[in-house]
Amino acid sequence: GSTLEVPYYVKKAAMHAGKNFGRLSIVLPEQTLTFEVCATTDGAKAVSEEHLELQCGRMRLAQLYIDYRLKKIVTGAWANQSVELLDHMMAMEPECEMYALMKAQALIVNRQKQEASWIMEDYKRGCRDRETPEWGYYLYLCTLIEREPSYVDKLTDEIELLFKKNPKSSLLFWILLFLRESYYYSSPRKYKAIEAWIEGGCSSPYLYLESYYLIWQDPYLLTRLGTYELKVLRWAMRQGVLTKELAQQIRHLLPEVREKSRVLYEILEAAYQVEPEEEMLSAICAYLIRTQCYETEYHRWYELGIEQKIRLTGLYEAYLMSLDAREVGGVPRMIQMYFQYDSTLSYTQKAVLFVNIIAARTKQPEVYQKYQRTMEQFAMAQIEAGHINDHLAVIYDEMLPKGILDEELAHSLAPLLFTHRISCTNRQIARAIIWHEEMKMPQSVSFVNGTAYFKAYTPQYSIVLEDTNGNRFCSSVVYQDEALMYPERYVDQCL
């Protein structure tokens, strides 16, 4: 029939009080059906708007502190904005004692110690449980007010005992980063300690800040580009604080990396922004070649490397292999000349090179002349091998009129003359099934990057498309069917 029932489930725990709006989308090959959904709750178990506001407030507090530590804002601006935000959050959630203590810290740092002391005295009088991380935070604030070494050592010992009782408290660990003598005298030890927490699953922005702060102050602490280092560097990249010195250290470590990493690539993009030097570009190109990054998105790096005349093994090959096969333009002259004498390219990449040379033959006739014999031999070899694609079709049409077609080659060319290309922009389409009136069984061809090739000896055929789920479509999916060659030009010679 014309009706389809689609059941769906709404998670009440993720709803706020009142009306909650959403959408259901049914994605078809050529259209998307969208239905508006409204669900209402009384708010008994829903996430309240107040809770969301507090969550946003905590995130804002963290970002303010990060901006202050990274010198994006001055002390007074950080303290005043934090106090204002904390006053608002205390009014919303008065039972949370941490807000008052955080306010006290902002006041202490801003040299308002008397106001901070009043807040801390109120907390101390009302605190009934002195074995919690919050009490440890209070003790830490005491060390900020009274800096006498023996007093600080005494409170540090108390915090250490609390940490033994609360070993999973990231708050207490963060506090000890500033109080433990072993961390004070050894930045590498401190850096490694934070690594254990972050690699253990802790995602506290305060720990990421402290880790980055260490390598910011001493880039040589960055001795490798492992998962921990990449997490911290990505955090720094998103904060917009990657420095030239860190970019240089990343460059020094890059030759040791042998595995392809999307995160590292994004960091390298940011590193080049702060250090757009030839050495950095060379290191990036070498890394991309070493990890076989030949997709079109990386082509700009190889192109830039050639423009800056970087001497790097495999750079010219990488340039061609990453060239967008759908675009035909001028290939740099040095690449054209290089591959005239030395070529380890696959036949598909050679075809890209030759098509670009053919396209530029009026502007660079001398290059075309030097390559003509090579292209003729290449065309003959590929016809004999039965290869055909868009670029090869251009080369065949260019070279065949030059007298290379003999009886033996004509026999190999005959089936290629009737090749069609079918293109479909819908990435859900996986196969095309071609039914010919003259044939009992259909052809079945697979799409690669939205393109497939099939043989059509007569105009009497029909095309059915099949998606990744096995669904078939006759006319509801848009596609383009185009002959690659002109068989009428050569069919008499092939018969």
Identify what each model region corresponds to:
Residues 1-417, 421-462, 467-473, 479-483, ...:
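Feature for long, exposed domains in two main contexts
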